UniProtKB/Swiss-Prot annotation:
Lineage: Bacteria, Pseudomonadati, Pseudomonadota, Alphaproteobacteria, Hyphomicrobiales
Function text: Transfers dimethylallyl groups to AMP as part of the biosynthesis of cytokinin phytohormones.
Pfam families for this protein: IPT (PF01745)
SUPFAM superfamilies: P-loop containing nucleoside triphosphate hydrolases
Protein name: Adenylate dimethylallyltransferase
Entry GO MF terms: AMP dimethylallyltransferase activity
Catalytic activity: dimethylallyl diphosphate + AMP = N(6)-(dimethylallyl)adenosine 5'-phosphate + diphosphate
Alphabetic keyword roster: Cytokinin biosynthesis, Plasmid, Transferase
One GO BP: cytokinin biosynthetic process
């Protein structure tokens, strides 16, 4: 089986590339994203809309309520291995995402040395100003109701009604920033979806900056795998981390 690995920081266009490859090959895409395993935060976690998938198949490693917490990296890695084994009849599989902890689990596991062929594509952070422009556009889209999916702020307002979800939301990019913004401006969380345009723009910029901080962390902590445009065997677990 050929495993096509696409990884990189948030807002780098990984999902779009994965969808394009899936359209050309017909292969499924497995999301290497622990937060996207919670459908209740589909918007804030960056799950693509059904229309954006363009009839391609996207597989999540779990589907759980937020009250159960975010799946841990080791659990996600076990599910990933099961999914790859389940898809063994496929000619290829696309692995796409940016979970640092999950990718590092892969880098340490001997499973990925067991005869797969690899095509590795890493997307880079690049220029900070260009990143912030992309991130602002992404957050602006998250603040809109699209295809009947609630906005990020509506997801937050709804889930804030359940005390068990609050510490989890405070640990997720985007939601954490919105919660701090509400406290700073003496707003109730359920008021956030109705803030005026000026405050909304301030919050969009704040979340974009938080995404940049997260992207810098990802760039620092990702495993370093060679990128190869040919169908060459590549064993990620055999590679040394570049400091």
């Amino acid at each position: 089986m050929l495993l096509y690995l696409i990884y990189g920081p948030t807002c780098s266009g990984k999902t779009d590339i994965a969808i394009q490859i899936a359209q050309k090959t017909g292969w499924p895409v497995v999301a290497l994203d622990r937060v996207q395993c919670c459908p209740q935060i589909a918007t804030g976690s960056g799950r693509p809309l059904p229309s954006e998938l363009q009839s391609t198949r996207r597989i999540y490693l779990d589907s759980r309520r937020l009250t159960k917490g975010i799946i841990d990296a080791e659990g996600a890695h076990r599910r990933l291995i099961l999914e790859v084994d389940w898809q063994e009849s496929e000619e290829g599989l696309i692995l796409e995402g940016g979970s640092v902890s999950l990718l590092n689990c892969m880098a340490k596991s001997p499973y990925w040395k067991s005869g797969f062929q690899w095509h590795v594509k890493r997307l880079r952070l690049g220029d900070s100003d260009a990143f912030l422009a992309r991130a602002k556009q992404r957050v602006t889209e998250m603040f809109a109701i699209r295809e009947d999916r609630p906005s990020l702020l509506e997801e937050l307002a709804e889930l804030w009604n359940y005390p068990a979800t609050r510490p989890i939301l405070e640990d997720i990019d985007g939601y954490r920033c919105a919660i701090r913004f509400a406290r700073k401006h003496d707003l109730a969380i359920n008021q956030l979806p109705d803030i005026d345009a000026e405050r909304q723009q301030d919050l969009i910029e704040a979340i974009a900056k938080e995404y940049l901080e997260h992207a810098i962390m990802q760039e620092r902590d990702f495993p370093q795998w060679p990128e190869d445009g040919a169908r060459q065997p590549v064993g990620p677990a055999t590679l040394m981390r570049i400091q």
